[in-house]
Amino acid sequence: MIKSELVQRIAEHNPHLYQRDVENIVNAILDEIVAALARGDRVELRGFGAFSVKHRPARAGRNPRTGAHVPVDQKSVPFFKTGKEMRERLNRDNPAGAADTDD
């Protein structure tokens, strides 16, 4: 699912809201999550999961084409840990061995 599909589904479930208003709300939520992560804050949505930033130290890498060693700078990467309720629902709705689909 892409963001526009998410906006459309939320608008369909809330006919009293205009789709452009839903889009503005979704964008505002995502912007606030990104801003909080940029400040170094952790964002926790109970039952859904928690967003945080992990810091990767500088390291020595290798150019796969030439084999030459190259320095890789330290970097910050976003990290998401699912909440307990989400994990339970995913495991209940998609038992082990069931085929995954990209719907």
From Swiss-Prot:
Q: Which GO terms describe its molecular function?
A: DNA binding; structural constituent of chromatin
* Keyword hit for Disulfide bond: no
Recite the UniProt keywords alphabetically: DNA recombination, DNA-binding, Transcription, Transcription regulation, Translation regulation
State if Disulfide bond is listed as a keyword: no
Q: A single GO CC term, please?
A: cytosol
Give the record's GO biological process terms: DNA recombination; regulation of DNA-templated transcription; regulation of translation
Q: Where are the transmembrane segments?
A: none
Note the NCBIfam families from the entry: hip, PRK00199.1
What PANTHER family does UniProt report for this protein, alphabetically?
DNA-BINDING PROTEIN HU, INTEGRATION HOST FACTOR SUBUNIT BETA
The UniProt family comment states: Belongs to the bacterial histone-like protein family.
Q: What does this protein do?
A: This protein is one of the two subunits of integration host factor, a specific DNA-binding protein that functions in genetic recombination as well as in transcriptional and translational control.
Query: Subunit info?
Result: Heterodimer of an alpha and a beta chain.
UniProt protein name: Integration host factor subunit beta
**Source organism of this protein record:** Bradyrhizobium sp. (strain BTAi1 / ATCC BAA-1182)
Quote the gene name from the UniProt entry: ihfB
